Amino acid sequence: MSGMRVYLGADHAGYELKRQIIEHLKQSGHQPIDCGAFSYDVDDEYPAFCITAATRTVADPGSLGIVLGGSGNGEQIAANKVVGARCALAWSVETARLAREHNNAQLIGIGGRMHTVAEALTIVDAFVTTPWSEAQRHQRRIDILAEFERTHQAPPVPGAQA
């Protein structure tokens, strides 16, 4: 999976880590695309950067995205507001790998204050190199979520009283 286009968005808390990840991705043969912040501003707000990165990722099939902030939590939530986005909070190599393999996540959120640069880069590498498994059981679940996103009708709860 070399040569991936990877859209990145970060607020001030993820700004420096984003710069490190961009350089790492370039050195690894990928094409990082910076969606901001473009300078360090302690008063910036993460939603614009994360929504932009997620919007561009969803609009570019086959691409991936990474959103960064202090914890990655709010950034992941913001990215998931974009219709069609599947953004997982990746706090380990295993969660990054499973996000791709089981959930076909196009984006991950990483906490810039939660990891060393070396740890974050191993998480990024796991994410960009792990393929989607295409397993039917995982696809069914993704389809259920996509249908809910489209219709806003919750799926029936198995075993629930009608």
Curated annotation (Swiss-Prot):
Q: Which GO terms describe its biological process?
A: D-allose catabolic process; pentose-phosphate shunt, non-oxidative branch
Query: Does the record's keyword annotation contain Metal-binding?
Result: no
User: Which residues are catalytic?
Assistant: 75, 102
Q: What does the UniProt function comment say about this protein?
A: Catalyzes the interconversion of ribulose-5-P and ribose-5-P.
Family designation: Belongs to the LacAB/RpiB family.
Q: What is this protein called?
A: Ribose-5-phosphate isomerase B
Q: How does it assemble?
A: Homodimer.
**Which Pfam family, any one, appears in the UniProt record?**
LacAB_rpiB
Species = Mycobacterium leprae (strain TN)
Q: Which residues bind D-ribulose 5-phosphate?
A: 11-12, 70-74, 103, 113, 137, 141
| Key word Isomerase present | yes
- UniProt GO molecular function: ribose-5-phosphate isomerase activity
Which reaction does this enzyme catalyse, per its entry?
A: aldehydo-D-ribose 5-phosphate = D-ribulose 5-phosphate
Pathway note: Carbohydrate degradation; pentose phosphate pathway; D-ribose 5-phosphate from D-ribulose 5-phosphate (non-oxidative stage): step 1/1
> Anything else the record notes?
In mycobacterial enzymes, the usual proton acceptor is not a cysteine, but is remplaced by a glutamate.
Sorted alphabetically, the keyword list is: Carbohydrate metabolism, Isomerase
PANTHER family in the record: DNA DAMAGE-REPAIR_TOLERATION PROTEIN DRT102 (PTHR30345:SF0), RIBOSE-5-PHOSPHATE ISOMERASE B (PTHR30345)
Q: What is its EC number?
A: 5.3.1.6
